């Protein structure tokens, strides 16, 4: 596998994509959506191979859930592509501008980034999400999925490339590194002659590896140690529903609740209600000493929480429970252990809600809502390429605009600077 050749081909494809009209790009996306559904049986056969290997290798249920494709999930992915078609094309958008003192017309115009490298783990849906978002924004993409999704990724990329060729577009607009050798990841991270941005989607180890080794700008994000703080004025029955949703709806996602913070003044009243509410959800609790004594009396499956577990993205039905004295202690805990992803407060106090929003440093902050909303589709951005937890270039779910940059376009009448 020649990565330099792959990079060169991607750069050439990006030049073609940058010139396409919105209609040309949308036509290609429509065919991709149709082919995903038409080829779903082939996709499921290949996905079953990944699932079988995952089980043989003893991977967790959480990882297998990320790997799994079903007819329903493929249809959902295809519908996400159709939603991207319906979104306005940001390319060519005039962000701002005006007439300069010299009479020259100046405009700031949105343009594609060029070539994007995306490194991700056990999520085959990311293959389609990323490829179609990049195509919509006129970017070429080099994908490197995890070895756990090898069969699924190969068939998905083949379906996408075939659809591109049907519309006369270069199939090299979407390419994949299929060799599991990690040296190819390292080589991709050094391919700054051709690649304009690297987006890692995976655990903290992957992000750190990319930060340490890349000569290309890296978007960091996706690691979600998310908190919900139940403040003493919260409506408790409604709070239980939010916690249930944030923890159990799909535990393997990065916007799932990992640590519940409960104000001390309501802990003895609220925690028994929590256990009763979640009793059929197979939640395992990891609690501080105060919470432990309360939860044990409810016959909950509970153990003492270890310090390192407070920094852990469980990706499962494990839940940390910590008692805090007040909002200041809750914010301090989030500052120490959070990953700047998604944080929530449940409260009836507008003043405390404002304080929480102002002081918590995260890409998304919620008042009386589940952290599960941190998602490109939920935010109306279409499928997301990643959730950025950094502050430069993009923050939060990265939709179409996050895959663009801008250039200054200056138009004069043979104007010279005086």
UniProtKB/Swiss-Prot annotation:
GO terms for cellular component: cytoplasm. Keywords: Amino-acid biosynthesis, Cytoplasm, NADP, Oxidoreductase, Proline biosynthesis. It catalyses: L-glutamate 5-semialdehyde + phosphate + NADP(+) = L-glutamyl 5-phosphate + NADPH + H(+). Pfam families: Aldedh. One of its GO terms (molecular function) is glutamate-5-semialdehyde dehydrogenase activity. It is found in: Cytoplasm. Signal peptide: none annotated. The keyword Cell inner membrane does not apply. CDD domains: ALDH_F18-19_ProA-GPR. One of its GO terms (biological process) is L-proline biosynthetic process. Its EC number is 1.2.1.41. Pathway: Amino-acid biosynthesis; L-proline biosynthesis; L-glutamate 5-semialdehyde from L-glutamate: step 2/2. Catalyzes the NADPH-dependent reduction of L-glutamate 5-phosphate into L-glutamate 5-semialdehyde and phosphate. The product spontaneously undergoes cyclization to form 1-pyrroline-5-carboxylate. Belongs to the gamma-glutamyl phosphate reductase family. This is Gamma-glutamyl phosphate reductase. It comes from Histophilus somni (strain 129Pt).
């Amino acid at each position: 596998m020649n990565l330099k050749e792959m990079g060169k081909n991607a750069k050439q494809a990006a030049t073609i994509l940058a010139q396409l009209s919105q209609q040309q790009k949308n036509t290609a996306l429509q065919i991709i959506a149709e082919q995903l559904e038409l080829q779903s049986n082939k996709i499921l056969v290949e996905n079953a191979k990944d699932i079988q290997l995952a089980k043989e290798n003893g991977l967790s249920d959480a990882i297998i859930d990320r790997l799994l494709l079903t007819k329903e999930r493929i249809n959902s992915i295809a519908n996400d592509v159709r939603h991207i078609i319906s979104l306005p094309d940001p390319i060519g958008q005039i962000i701002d501008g005006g007439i300069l003192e010299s009479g020259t017309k100046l405009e700031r115009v949105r343009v594609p980034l060029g070539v994007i490298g995306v490194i991700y783990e056990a999520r085959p849906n990311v293959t389609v999400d990323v490829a179609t978002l990049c195509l919509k924004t006129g970017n070429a993409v080099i994908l490197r999925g995890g070895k756990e999704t090898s069969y699924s990724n190969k068939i998905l990329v083949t379906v996408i490339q075939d659809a591109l060729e049907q519309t006369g577009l270069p199939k090299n607009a979407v390419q994949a590194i299929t060799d599991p050798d990690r040296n190819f990841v390292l080589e991709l991270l050094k391919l700054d002659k051709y690649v304009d941005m690297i987006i890692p989607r995976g655990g903290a180890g992957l992000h750190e590896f990319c930060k340490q080794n890349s000569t290309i700008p890296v978007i960091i994000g996706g690691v979600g140690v998310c908190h919900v703080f139940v403040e003493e004025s919260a409506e408790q029955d409604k709070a239980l529903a939010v916690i249930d949703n944030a923890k159990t709806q799909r535990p393997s996602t990065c916007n799932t609740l990992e640590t519940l913070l409960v104000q001390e003044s309501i802990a003895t009243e609220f925690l028994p209600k929590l256990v009763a509410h979640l009793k059929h959800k197979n939640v395992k609790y990891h609690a501080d000493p105060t919470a432990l004594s309360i939860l044990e009396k409810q016959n909950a499956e509970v153990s003492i929480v270890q310090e390192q577990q407070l920094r852990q993205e469980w990706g499962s039905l494990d839940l940390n429970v910590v008692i805090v004295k007040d909002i200041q202690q809750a914010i301090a805990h989030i500052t120490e252990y959070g990953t700047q992803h998604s944080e929530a407060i449940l409260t009836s106090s507008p003043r405390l809600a404002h304080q929480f929003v102002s002081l918590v440093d995260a890409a998304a902050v919620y008042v009386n809502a589940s952290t599960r909303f941190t998602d490109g589709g939920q935010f109306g951005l279409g499928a997301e390429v990643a959730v950025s937890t950094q502050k430069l270039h993009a923050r939060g779910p990265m939709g179409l605009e996050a895959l663009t940059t801008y250039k200054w376009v200056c138009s004069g009448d043979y104007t010279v600077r005086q």
